[in-house]
Amino acid sequence: NYHIRGRIIQVPSNYDPEKRTYSGIWDGSLKPAYSNNPAWCLWDMLTHPRYGMGKRLGAADVDKWALYAIGQYCDQTVPDGFGGTEPRMTFNAYLSQQRKVWDVLGDFCSAMRCMPVWNGQTLTFVQDRPSDVVWPYTNSDVVVDDNGVGFRYSFSALKDRHTAVEVNYTDPQNGWQTSTELVEDPEAILRYGRNLLKMDAFGCTSRGQAHRAGLWVIKTELLETQTVDFTLGSQGLRHTPGDIIEICDNDYAGTLTGGRILSIDAASRTLTLDREVTLPEAGTSTVNLINGSGKPVRVDITAHPAP
């Protein structure tokens, strides 16, 4: 047997692929190096003119800045489940036959929990990772239908909430043959029953990474069970798939949770709202609003002048 490290690909110029560290601010330039970071393996597949999409997609057509953030998240060190640590996500695979580019793109993206999105200018990528709220929406922002409903809620089907996952991955401890990692949620099995899903972890050669992939599927399906549907005006054009938003629905909360600001007095630091509000007698009250940079911020309320 012999071990093939794989291709030398283009990686950020400020990136050390051996130590998986980044120095300074990236200027956008690239350098050749060996790397199994899935973000830059994807970049190589999309931009290489011989075996990739390089003859149809130029470097300017792929959002390398989004891949840079994704690559940093993949390189973060996490417990491997056996007392040590390892990168969160690595990619070790080879393509032995010609396939449709969309299928290959989906396999590459599945290795780092992201999806491709064409934003009108470039092919960018949205990853499921912790992020800040992009924008809050209240009842005053949405279009009300003929029934007087602005936010419409629905839930996932019980059959779509898997409680056990069998993850197939390439196991170095098994002669680089396929092994299966079983991931279960005992509490969910007691509540919903055993609902098994079988999946392949493309490019995965780590048992710990395979376990995390199965655990992510279980937690996502058990915790993200509710969806909300609503209609916006032109302000909704600011979003791309994957943006995290905040819903302040008065009907859902059973109290007034949002509205509009009519005027701002900067000298007295006073906000005039479109309705009367009552602050709780105890605790700290805050107001969520959009600052001058177009980002949501949370500000403490220090006083409530009489209307």
What residue spans do the PLM features occupy?
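Short, hydrophobic/proline-enriched secondary-structure or compact coil segments at domain edges
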Residues: 1-7
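C-terminal extracytoplasmic interaction modules
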Residues: 16, 21, 25, 31-307
